[in-house]
Amino acid sequence: MESVGDPRDGPSTERAFEGQPVPPWTEQVTLRAVVASVALGVALSSVMMNLVFTSGIIPSLNISAGLLGFFLLKAWTRLLDQLGSPGRPFTRQENAVVQTCVVACASMTYSGGFGSYLLAMDRKTAEKTSTGDDSSASVSEPEFGRMMAFFFLVSFVGLLAIVPMRKTMIIRHRLTFPSGSATAHLINSFHTPHGARQAKRQVSLVLRSSLASLFWSIFQWFYTGGPNCGFTSFPTFGLSAFNRGFYISLNGTYVGIGMISPHLINVSMLFGSIISWGIMRPYIRSKRGIWYDADLQETNLKSFSGYKVFCAIAMILGDGIFQLVAISLRTIHTVRHHQVAAETLRSFSDVDAMPRPVMSFDDRRRTQVFLREHIPSTFAISGYVVLATVSTVVIPLMYGQVRYYHVAAAYAFAPVLAFCNAYGTGVAETNFSAQYNKLVILMFASWIGIKNGGIVGSLVICGIVSSIVSTASDFMSDFKTSYLTLTSPRATLVSQVIGTAMGCVVNPAVFTVFHHFYEMNPNKTYQAPLAKIYRGIAVLGAGGLELPKYCLAISATFFVLALAVCAMREVAAHGKWRAEPYIPSVTGMAVSFLLVPAVSIDMCIGSLIVFLWNRNDKLGSQVFGPVLASGLICGDGLFSIPYALLARYDVTPPICIRFLGRVQNDKLDAFLASKAKAG
């Protein structure tokens, strides 16, 4: 494998901190850091849970966690100073510990499958998709106690699986881990005089945008006293387009996600919405009663929903398989290139004039600190074996659809997937955990079979693998942050363990609130598109579904098109074509098949804001754009818990604003007039 190094030109970062001693790891994990992490972990877990239930798209909140952690602890130390009892100085290492702990807690909403495999197990999803697979063996209700026990069993294994590889990835191959590096540079900048002033402006912006988004959500709620009511149902492009889902809802969450997501993803989603909701949906609906039973509900996978869901699955699988093959070939090529280079160097080993890489001051200091506090590999390996053994015994008792050999097989190959995923994340921030999840579901659903509970069984195994693979890549990214901020690896491990333990309790509790009012109707707020995809894959793999007419042929066509588009993107990138930035993302298009087009339109509005901001003030856009986006997402997400509780206890908004066509309005006026005369 070739080394991917950090750029060493330019001013030294560590020279600015040379006079500051690096505190021992026991002083980096402090009580105030843990308290701040708990507060931020609960808040961001609620925000992330709102995202997995609405769009299924999860942006990185690392920057938000680092920024808010800096704000809380800085305010804490300032308050103590004013009270005359100053505490220990607030260091960048403590800031990194808070960021690691918070992200470990909040990211479990995705790796824990709360909007995907876990939700796909329940009876409500089975009934809404109506595939005839809602027997007791094919459903499993998400109970709080069982969820918490399951996550305590599987969530810590991913940490131990990747610990032995930290030196190889961070020191030897110098993988960049873009997200971890960006977070580290941000934290480093906070703790310089200029960076502290800029951080104050960023904190002010995130608070103001969060409050604005929160109050906008509250204001909108008062006018949603019925179906299709409120400003979110404004027929921006006319009633005909509105009936097909094309309108602007100005949802703070989606606009914020659009500001963070690449332009290509947002435009790809809009393109996919036009294909699925604008072209494919009306055509297939015209075949109702011919291709599928007209008496079935649209959400039934044997009716219209089957075309929509399985076309999306085909595209996602096509993209995933292509990317897995591509990264495997790249890895083999890189290994061979490294071996050839090593042999060449050995053949010239007697030549003293060979150029040798010289480490910069920053690299020397960071490497020294990173290697100083050792985490024994024997501890990690033995811990993995012990936890895997316990899980192999206990999980079949919790879920009767799986056997001990299914669990053992998952734990046997999961570390390989974890390494591959962490390596891809380190090179180019390419996280393939979702693709691994889908392949695992297909394999184990086929192995277990529909009669033996293959649907739930494969989803449980998916949960085990997902927890290991996703956690491992996130943890290695945190190691990169700790390397660049001179944070002890032991402090990083301890903070990750604390954050994971928090997530095992906080996320099931938050999920329980959301699950009470979860609706699968695509016109409702909580669409949970990934739950339908994951259950559809499990049903397909287990062989328990008869698809509607021509569904398989149409899905196969989309699968081939996905491979073609992926191949075109690869060739364009290799050949440096000018058209390469305009080739759409397959997964972006696929996700939009299961979301109303209003989501992709709002995300494109976010993209447009960033584009115009970049043209006016590129530096300001780069510094404050992600902060503004995070504020919009957090503000709207914070209202999700009160919204859930209001819906849970049937509290109805007092006003309904609805937009009608002229003909409908005339009929309504005539009806009201007749009622008035009769009265």
From Swiss-Prot:
Membrane topology listed for this record: Multi-pass membrane protein
Stretches with biased composition (Basic and acidic residues): 1-17
Annotated region described as Disordered, given as residue ranges: 1-21
Subcellular location: Membrane
InterPro entries attached to this UniProt entry: OPT, YSL-like
Source taxon at top rank: Eukaryota
UniProt keyword list: Membrane, Transmembrane, Transmembrane helix, Transport
Family from the record: Belongs to the YSL (TC 2.A.67.2) family.
Function: May be involved in the transport of nicotianamine-chelated metals.
Designated name of the protein: Probable metal-nicotianamine transporter YSL18
Origin species: Oryza sativa subsp. japonica (Rice)
